[in-house]
Amino acid sequence: MALLQISEPGLSAAPHQRRLAAGIDLGTTNSLVATVRSGQAETLPDHEGRHLLPSVVHYQQQGHTVGYAARDNAAQDTANTISSVKRMMGRSLADIQARYPHLPYRFKASVNGLPMIDTAAGLLNPVRVSADILKALAARASESLSGELDGVVITVPAYFDDAQRQGTKDAARLAGLHVLRLLNEPTAAAIAYGLDSGKEGVIAVYDLGGGTFDISILRLSRGVFEVLATGGDSALGGDDFDHLLADYIREQAGIADRSDNRVQRELLDAAITAKIALSDADTVRVNVAGWQGEITREQFNDLISALVKRTLLACRRALKDAGVEPQDVLEVVMVGGSTRVPLVRERVGEFFGRTPLTAIDPDKVIAIGAAIQADILVGNKPDSEMLLLDVIPLSLGLETMGGLVEKVIPRNTTIPVARAQDFTTFKDSQTAMSIHVMQGERELVQDCRSLARFALRGIPPLPAGGAHIRVTFQVDADGLLSVTAMEKSTGVEASIQVKPSYGLTDGEIASMIKDSMSFAEQDVKARMLAEQKVEAARVLESLTGALTADAALLSAAERQCIDDAAAHLSAVAQGDDVDAIEQAIKNVDKQTQEFAARRMDQSVRRALKGHSVDEV
C-alpha cells in the first residue's frame, strides 16, 4: 500500500513545485501586477512592453475595455469611461459628490446610499469597476506565467478603513481571485527595499500616488518589519496636481465653460502631459482647445506648493507619533509616480535632511513588495524568517458608563492582534448589556467615532458587579475588526464584524489625532469628572438597595446621618467639582461603615442558622 503524501497546509506538496502567486498594486491612476521568478521580483508587462495599466475602464453595450484602450476613449466618451474608481471605494454617493463635484459620471444611489454609475453597460458600482481592472491584471499574469494564479496579495492605502478594504476584497472575489492578504502600500515598499538593501534602522516611506498620500515610519531590524506610525491623506495625490494645472491652463486659455466633458478631458490630458515633461524640462509648450502657450516649472511649483506642504505636515505628525526626529531617519523611500516631481523630491529631502531613495522604480516598488509577500504566503518560501507587522491607525475601544471610552487596542498596535477586557454589570439583576464600539483618541464618546453597536442578552440576573462579561477585539491581517462579548459563567455570547457603510472623511484621522493632543489636559479632567459621577451613581444606587432591605438595622439618628450624606452626594454629583464629589463619596462611605458591618453580621448569622460548628 502506497504511503499518503502529506504536506503542511498552504505549502506545495512537491518540493520543487512552485505555486503561482502575484502581487497587485491596485492604484488610483495606474495599476501593476508582479511576481517572483528565479528568486527575483519583477513587474509583468503587456504585449507592447508596458508595465503600467491605467486604472481606467471604458464600458459599452457590447462589453468593455481596460487600460490604455479605455483611456484613449476618455475624451470622446467621458460618461462611460471610469477612472480613479479607487477614490469611490467604500464611500457613499453623498460623500463622493461632496468630495469630487466635477466628476463627469451619471450617478444614481442604491437603496443603502452607495454609488451606482449609469453606463452604456448598465448600472455599475465601484466594486464591479475595480473587479474589471483586477481581471485584466490577472489575465496578464496568467498568460505570462502560463497558468492560473493560486493567490494574490493586493495592496491598499494605509488609510483605507474597513469598508474600503472589504470593497477591495469583494472586487477580488468578483474577479475570481483568491486573496492571500491585503497589504498596506507603505509596508509593501518596506518589503521591497528591506530585502534589496538590507538596511537596519528607522526609515520613512513617503508614498505619493495618483489619489492618496501615505507616510509610514518603520523600523527594519534583522528581517523584522515593524510599522511605528502611519499618517497621510486619503484624498491627496498626483490627480490633484493634474487638476490644479488643468484649471491654470483653463484660465490662461480663457475657457469658461465647465460643462463640456470633452474639453474637460482634453485639459486634463494636457495637464498630465505637461506635468510629466516638467520633471525633466524647465519649460513646456501646451496646445489645447485652440490655445497655445508655455508653462514653466516655476509656475507649476507655485501651483502645487501648498499640497506638498500638506504632505510634510503629515510627515511631522507621523514622526511625533513614532517618537523619532527627522535626523533619526536613516533612509527615506520614495513611492508613487508623483514622487518624480522635482519639487516633491526637493522638499522631502530638505525636511528629512537627506537625499531620498529612488533606486527602485517608484511606480513599481509597491507591486514588487506585494509579489514578494505573495510568494511567501502561497508557500514558496516556507523557511523565510521575515516578519511583517502592520498597525491600526486609530485606537479601538468601548463606551463605558458616564459616556467614557475605554481603549481596548491603542493606535499603532501591530496587527493581526486580539485583546480582551472584562467588564461587570452596573445594576442589580441586569440581564443585557449594550456594546458600543468606538474609534478614536479622545476620552469621551462624544469626541470619538462610532463604529458599531450590538447587545449581549441572557446575562444571569445577579447583583451589580456579579456578572462578568469578557469583550474581545480581534483585528485580522487585513485590518478588519471583529468584536465578541461573552458572559463568563454561562458562555452566552454575541458578536459583530465592523463594516461601516462608508469611509472616514478627509483628514478625519489626522484631525482626531491632533485633537487628542490639543485637548489632552481638558480630556483628562473631563474623564476624572465622569468617573467620579459614575462612582457617585453606583454608591447611591447600592445604598438605596441596602436601605430598602435592611433599614431596620439603623436608629433614627443613624438613618438621618446617612440620608444627609446621600443627599449631599446627590447634589454635588450634579456639579463639576471633582474634589467635592470625591469627598462626598468618602463621607457616605464613612457614614455607612457601621451599617455595612451590621449587614455583614446579619448575613453571616443567617448563613449559619441551623448548622452546627462541625458542619461549618
From Swiss-Prot:
Molecular functions per Gene Ontology: ATP binding; ATP hydrolysis activity; ATP-dependent protein folding chaperone; unfolded protein binding
A Gene Ontology BP annotation from the UniProt entry: iron-sulfur cluster assembly
Family per record: Belongs to the heat shock protein 70 family.
Keywords linked to the UniProt accession: ATP-binding, Chaperone, Nucleotide-binding
Organism: Salmonella typhi
Transmembrane segments: none
CDD domains membership: ASKHA_NBD_HSP70_HscA (cd10236)
Listed name of the protein: Chaperone protein HscA
Function field: Chaperone involved in the maturation of iron-sulfur cluster-containing proteins. Has a low intrinsic ATPase activity which is markedly stimulated by HscB. Involved in the maturation of IscU.
Domain of life: Bacteria
Keyword Protease: no
PROSITE patterns: HSP70_1, HSP70_2, HSP70_3
Gene name of the encoded protein: hscA
Keyword DNA damage attributed: no
Pfam families according to UniProt: HSP70
